[in-house]
A protein has these predicted regions:
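Class I (Rossmann-like) S-adenosyl-L-methionine-dependent methyltransferase catalytic domain
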Residues: 1-103, 117-124, 128-131, 135-201
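A conserved beta-strand element that flanks and buttresses the S-adenosyl-L-methionine
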Residues: 109
Length: 201
């Protein structure tokens, strides 16, 4: 379901509204830091070492500082499709749909990116996320269920493609196992997770 036709320039006005303006922002550095702490804790608990992080669609890089403290040995790389942010923060320019580095990363972050892609590109992006990730993936995307029940619509960007959570999970499960809270691990990776700690099937 498309709320509006997708034609979103990710320039200064977009990031001022959704990330910098206290009255309209969708998240804060503190919230993103807590999210990074959760991701790091789950991977540590599962016994998955992290030496390289790719933040695909990193925006302002709000998780970078937290990861530097939580995973000090991990190299962080920000990937952005916004030329404005790449120029400002020196991120790597590219799309999660087809970006291919020389080597995959232990942890790939894809936070609030996939809903900006049409169905074909979103499906391609999930396949590419599997190629980008050596071990783990954190993914979050605004879903139809979130739009109906969870998000603050006065702050949430309407210029997106809404799909069910099931649509994403079905495609992710071809490559990953879900550890919970949006953290997935590659199917060939050994991760010790007790039965009652796993998400319900």
């Amino acid at each position: 379901m498309d709320i509006k036709a997708h034609n979103q320039p990710f320039g200064p006005a977009y990031f001022r509204k959704y990330y910098l303006n206290r009255a309209t922002r969708v998240t804060t550095a503190a919230e993103m830091g807590a999210r990074a702490a959760l991701i790091a804790a789950i991977l540590r608990h599962a016994g998955i070492p992290v030496h390289g992080i790719l933040d695909a669609g990193c925006g302002l890089g709000l998780m970078r500082t937290a990861f530097a403290e939580l995973l000090p040995r991990a190299r962080y790389r920000g990937l952005e499709a916004s030329e404005y942010l790449c120029a400002r923060f020196n991120w790597s320019f590219g799309s999660v749909v087809d970006f291919r580095p020389v080597k995959p990363y232990d942890l790939v972050i894809c936070y609030d990116v996939l809903q900006y892609l049409g169905e074909r590109d979103a499906a391609r992006a999930i396949v590419n996320l599997a190629a980008l990730s050596r071990a783990a993936l954190y993914v979050s995307a605004l879903t139809l269920e979130d739009w109906r029940s969870n998000c603050d619509r006065s702050r949430t960007d309407r210029n997106v493609h809404l799909r069910s959570g099931l649509w994403y999970r079905r495609r992710l499960r071809r490559h990953f196992r879900h550890l919970g809270f949006g953290v997935w691990v590659r199917r060939n990776v050994t991760a010790i997770v007790w039965d009652m700690e796993r998400p319900a099937p």
